[in-house]
Amino acid sequence: MAKAISLEEIKNETVDLEKIPIEEVFEQLKCTREGLSADEGASRLQIFGPNKLEEKNESKILKFLGFMWNPLSWVMEAAAVMAIALANGDGKPPDWQDFIGIICLLVINSTISFIEENNAGNAAAALMAGLAPKTKVLRDGRWSEQEAAILVPGDIISVKLGDIIPADARLLEGDPLKIDQSALTGESLPVTKNPGDEVFSGSTCKQGELEAVVIATGVHTFFGKAAHLVDSTNNVGHFQKVLTAIGNFCICSIAIGMLVEIIVMYPIQHRKYRDGIDNLLVLLIGGIPIAMPTVLSVTMAIGSHRLSQQGAITKRMTAIEEMAGMDVLCSDKTGTLTLNKLSVDRNLVEVFAKGVDKEYVLLLAARASRVENQDAIDACMVGMLADPKEARAGIREVHFLPFNPVDKRTALTYIDNNNNWHRASKGAPEQILDLCNAKEDVRRKVHSMMDKYAERGLRSLAVARRTVPEKSKESPGGRWEFVGLLPLFDPPRHDSAETIRRALNLGVNVKMITGDQLAIAKETGRRLGMGTNMYPSASLLGQDKDSAIASLPIEELIEKADGFAGVFPEHKYEIVKKLQERKHIVGMTGDGVNDAPALKKADIGIAVADATDAARGASDIVLTEPGLSVIISAVLTSRAIFQRMKNYTIYAVSITIRIVFGFMFIALIWKYDFSAFMVLIIAILNDGTIMTISKDRVKPSPMPDSWKLKEIFATGVVLGGYQALMTVVFFWAMHDTDFFSDKFGVKSLRNSDEEMMSALYLQVSIISQALIFVTRSRSWSFLERPGMLLVIAFMIAQLVATLIAVYANWAFARVKGCGWGWAGVIWLYSIIFYLPLDIMKFAIRYILSGKAWNNLLDNKTAFTTKKDYGKEEREAQWALAQRTLHGLQPPEATNLFNEKNSYRELSEIAEQAKRRAEMARLRELHTLKGHVESVVKLKGLDIETIQQHYTV
């Protein structure tokens, strides 16, 4: 007998619980197969600690200082050093006011970043707590689902298909498990674990179900020890690369401006040393978008919180930008497009065995089901009985074989009242037919019934039985007999059809990926209005392709298909891979352990509600509510978040260009030295205003969106260049002419550099901040209502700027108030030259889209002799495309959507077709039948479904 040791010694690992016999494990851990009591579990938790890895607590001070350690902050810090080190010349003291101002700007920016990120981090931690792994544990003699963190050595847990093992444990009696240990050992194939073997925390159960006794938790597990040996890797994501590219563009623009100033001011113009340094400081301070990392990270954090409120928890923050760009969604049918609430029509049950009625077929199916911890099919089978207890009435359960994706069936070995042994099995018809080694006539009859069911959108479930004369659960038993076929109806969700229509309008192509038969997939697709261009999974391997699509390569077939049927997990992975090769941003939904590779491969892996731990672990977004509508809502929210970030980046690039080139030309042409301190005031007011962009109301992009750096830089350069030019023109009119004095009766500022400084400051401040209203809107800026917070922040900032320009009298900043008359003139000037900004924005977008060149070179629109610019051809192409997409006509070898035809043109044709259909509908209203059908169509009801399932 093993020497008894204390729990403290077990914690210190003085005994090797992995190698000793299982009975000694119970003895050493002072526990039984009945599990621990709740009190004992709580006391052991004090000894062993929670079952999770130690979290590194980052210093708050270091985290705060970290916000000052990035390339954009380095430039500002270099400017601060310049203000006191290099600006100490020409008999003037160091530029302390600019130094203090720069430090204040950095501290303000870091404080806002720290507070917002801390709040977002707390919110994210609360959300992720909801995703904390759960496990089935035996406490006080009852099985219950608990958080894995409460597990202690000695607990009895249940491990089933799809579970991530929550702690190191030894397996108890039962069938062997298949365990995927690739995350720990790198083994690519699942390993077989027999009773008595150890399973490691972090590995995944791929097949089987078994109980186990916990022997190590938290940092004492194999996974916990390994985690201490490796440092976390810092992968640079796409979002970080975009930030770096935009930051580098701004820094390079500033560097070019500074280089030009240095070359012109010192060797050519022979300016004073200190004047040159002051001008360089203006470009450095004003050009750097110091708030960019803060604004973008806060925007993403707030957006992530909003997504969680809609039922989508983001595990990876940058998944938001990928969700905004998603253009293909591969969706499961069961549970996502349908309710996953199955029912059986007793009248359609088909009996194959002699001396058996339909009720016995249902009873046998219920016996081959779980009575607890059920999935949807088990619950349906047991629920069809008058009393669920009948499933185990008069029999004694010997062994239950749970469902696994390979065998696709469940089975129960049981003993009846006469002490005879039997085995019942239910599962996929093909697997059950092979199990029974059915004759050809039986197979033909089964396939015929399956086709009839499928035409009505019904899935098939087969039932078989056999006797076990050897009276042993390991014995093969007698020959399997095919007993019957059951039709399962899984009704579509009430909102699926409308959601799919919304998805198509948003430019997201929804493809149904299902393991069901092709006929079921087509019928579901027809009911949901997503098309009937469905193909069997065999077509992905180049087999069983329809003659109409035989010439299509696999990639093109996947792209054009509305969905695939009879799909296995490896097919899902292949579908995602091929779509990505065609440059699509792909989303994939999944719920099972075998979906994990496809979820990992997809740009956005989406674990649906009630997904297994393995699917959640592989996904980027976890849904807390069922259905497709949650995903589409998340797409819209993601696009709104992305739009805010994109709006800000265009604004940041524009401001850099306008500050750098505006002040550079003024400094070089007129040798006028703008005050670096006043640029600091502009930067501080700008940052305060721009922080509100993270909560701005925006109109999401109507199509999938992504980081188009070419568009961001082009728009920023053009808008910023225009603003710089308007500032230069304003300064010329104020400095060299009496235009404003003559036209508006204000005093001339030509002889007062200090008053000109105030006027120039106000003009730059107004037009710089007003630009955000242009970059935030897709159409005319005055038609899209901004968020109230942004409007209030803008008004406060510009009120402060106007008061400074009117009343300030700061000798250190060379500023003197210019009066209310000039303030009014500057506001009028800014408003007049603000108006063309929208037109320029539209022009840039139009040129970059390529439509301008297409119209000019390809369509020759300006010189065409066709009436209505070839409208008839476009309508014909649209009609052909629609007929093909909905299975009414096979596709031709030629490209259906000629690339010359823009999305907008096709949309216009679609709108015209809708209007004609609406007119026809209104004419139908004159008949009673037409009125009833029209109302039904308007409410989105399916008349055929109503007729099938409801009778009077």
Swiss-Prot record:
Q: Which residues lie on this side of the membrane: Cytoplasmic?
A: 1-64, 118-246, 300-646, 697-712, 776-787, 839-952
Q: What is this protein called?
A: Plasma membrane ATPase 4
What keywords does the record list, in alphabetical order?
A: ATP-binding, Cell membrane, Hydrogen ion transport, Ion transport, Magnesium, Membrane, Metal-binding, Nucleotide-binding, Phosphoprotein, Translocase, Transmembrane, Transmembrane helix, Transport
Gene3D superfamilies listed in its UniProt record: 6.10.140.890, Calcium-transporting ATPase, cytoplasmic domain N (3.40.1110.10), Calcium-transporting ATPase, cytoplasmic transduction domain A (2.70.150.10), Calcium-transporting ATPase, transmembrane domain (1.20.1110.10), HAD superfamily/HAD-like (3.40.50.1000)
Q: Which GO terms describe its molecular function?
A: ATP binding; ATP hydrolysis activity; metal ion binding; P-type proton-exporting transporter activity
Q: Provide the reaction this enzyme catalyses.
A: ATP + H2O + H(+)(in) = ADP + phosphate + 2 H(+)(out)
Q: Where in the cell is it found?
A: Cell membrane
Q: Which organism is it from?
A: Nicotiana plumbaginifolia (Leadwort-leaved tobacco)
Query: Catalytic residues?
Result: D332 (4-aspartylphosphate intermediate)
Q: Which PANTHER family match?
A: CALCIUM-TRANSPORTING ATPASE
- Describe the function of this protein: The plasma membrane ATPase of plants and fungi is a hydrogen ion pump. The proton gradient it generates drives the active transport of nutrients by H(+)-symport. The resulting external acidification and/or internal alkinization may mediate growth responses.
Tell me the Pfam families matching this sequence.
Cation_ATPase_N, E1-E2_ATPase, Hydrolase
Extracellular topological domain: 85-96, 268-277, 669-673, 734-754, 809-817
The record lists the lineage as: Eukaryota, Viridiplantae, Streptophyta, Embryophyta, Tracheophyta
List the GO cellular component terms. Answer: plasma membrane
Tissue expression as described in the entry: Expressed at high levels in root, stem, leaf and flower.
Q: What is the membrane topology listed in the Swiss-Prot or TrEMBL record?
A: Multi-pass membrane protein
Transmembrane segments in this chain: where? 65-84, 97-117, 247-267, 278-299, 647-668, 674-696, 713-733, 755-775, 788-808, 818-838
